[in-house]
């Protein structure tokens, strides 16, 4: 409970900070985020940027779009949110965009056309668009008839303007029932819209036709909704998920390449010598149960107040590291050379230098399915969300 209370305080403090930053920007004062060399806020900010807001409730998203994304999530992650190794999604983020509005009108008797507008969010440098598809129902079954439908790009004063035949269909495993079609429109989105600045809207036409010989129905799409029959899928990859490690200084690199374990052995030898040096007792290492180790911890998104926009998973197991770092850092802790030297300095030179702390060493990602403020549904893999092992550094 204490950890949960502390986490809540930190989260609300971050929210207040972000609101203050927005207010400062609105009155013309520079925010901290725009100052040079300002450190980026942690991952929690990225999560909060996707949230609808404290006062907004979860947008009502039902029907096939939600079912599609839930199935995509279940195929890509397990019940705890861990990404599956055999996932075939081909991206670290998928956004389902529903049309903002539609203009429907009967045309040429048996033809029925809807014009659909899909808003495209501003580009983010960290994410690269790798695929774009439109999903629609190619068969609409009504009370007294049925319609055959297709999607085409909207072009002013053009009765028909089909997508290139090479763009039809999808090479990925389909999550769709037989009455639905997924069509690749990456070329159209990439060339026409994606690199444009300012407000961008993808406009498509949903065209349906009644079978020949059937009674012409004069209706305005009663009983059907384009919000549930057509949606856009945008696939992204995180370009910053794999960060290159900085090279070691030339001297240290040559030293470690000759004998990588030499520095570690010397540090251990110095540690054993330090035990014979007169000084304050270092018996605070304590019993083995107090040694630095990984501790399980689980919290629900409902406890964090995020369940109004996070669909899955329901529980989050971040884990945490706790315990005393030993006086001699053994190999299993994976401590960096700096921590080993710092430990020696604390033992032999200056006891005011703090000993290394017990912190997470390795993390694993978590997949989250959430609803954005505009009603879009987002699947996203967040790196560094679950601590898997600990180290002293």
Curated annotation (Swiss-Prot):
Pfam families per record: TGF_beta
Subcellular location: Secreted
Gene3D superfamilies (alphabetical): Cystine-knot cytokines
Propeptide section residues: 26-268
PROSITE patterns per the UniProt record, alphabetical: TGF_BETA_1 (PS00250), TGF_BETA_2 (PS51362)
Function of the protein: May be involved in follicular development. Oocyte-specific growth/differentiation factor that stimulates folliculogenesis and granulosa cell (GC) growth.
Quaternary structure and partners: Homodimer. But, in contrast to other members of this family, cannot be disulfide-linked.
Protein name: Bone morphogenetic protein 15
């Amino acid at each position: 409970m204490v950890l949960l209370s502390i986490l809540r305080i930190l989260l609300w403090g971050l929210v207040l900070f972000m609101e203050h930053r927005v207010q400062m920007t609105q009155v013309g004062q520079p925010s901290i985020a725009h100052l040079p060399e300002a450190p980026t806020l942690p991952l929690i900010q990225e999560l909060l940027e996707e949230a609808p807001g404290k006062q907004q409730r979860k947008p009502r998203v039902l029907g096939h779009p939600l079912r599609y994304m839930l199935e995509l999530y279940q195929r890509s992650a397990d019940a705890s949110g861990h990404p599956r190794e055999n996932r075939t999604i081909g991206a670290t983020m998928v956004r389902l965009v529903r049309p903002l509005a539609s203009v429907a009108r009967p045309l040429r008797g048996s033809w029925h056309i809807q014009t659909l507008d899909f808003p495209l969010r501003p580009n983010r440098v960290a994410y690269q668009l790798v695929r774009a598809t439109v999903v629609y129902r190619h068969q609409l079954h009504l009370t007294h008839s049925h319609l055959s439908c297709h999607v085409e790009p909207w072009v002013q004063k053009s009765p028909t303007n089909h997508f290139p035949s090479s763009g039809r269909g999808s090479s990925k495993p389909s999550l769709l029932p037989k009455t639905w079609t997924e069509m690749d429109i990456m070329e159209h989105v990439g060339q026409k819209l994606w690199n444009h600045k300012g407000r961008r809207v993808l406009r498509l036409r949903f065209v349906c036709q009644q079978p020949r010989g059937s009674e012409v129905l004069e209706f305005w799409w009663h009983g059907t909704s384009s919000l549930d029959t057509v949606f856009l899928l945008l696939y992204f990859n995180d370009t910053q998920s794999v960060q290159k490690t900085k090279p070691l200084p030339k001297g240290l690199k040559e030293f470690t390449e000759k004998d990588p374990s030499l520095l570690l052995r010397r540090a251990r030898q110095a540690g054993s010598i330090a035990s014979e040096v007169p000084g304050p007792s270092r018996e605070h290492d304590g019993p083995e149960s107090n040694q630095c180790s990984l501790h399980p911890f689980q919290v629900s998104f409902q406890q964090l107040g995020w369940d109004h926009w996070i669909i899955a998973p329901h529980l989050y197991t971040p884990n945490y590291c706790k315990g005393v770092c030993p006086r001699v850092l053994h190999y299993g802790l994976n401590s960096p050379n700096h921590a080993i030297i710092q430990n020696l300095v604390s033992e032999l030179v200056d006891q005011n230098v703090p000993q290394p702390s017990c912190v997470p060493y390795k993390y694993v990602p978590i997949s989250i399915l959430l609803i954005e403020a505009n009603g879009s549904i987002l699947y996203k893999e967040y790196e560094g969300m679950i601590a898997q092992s600990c180290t002293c550094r």
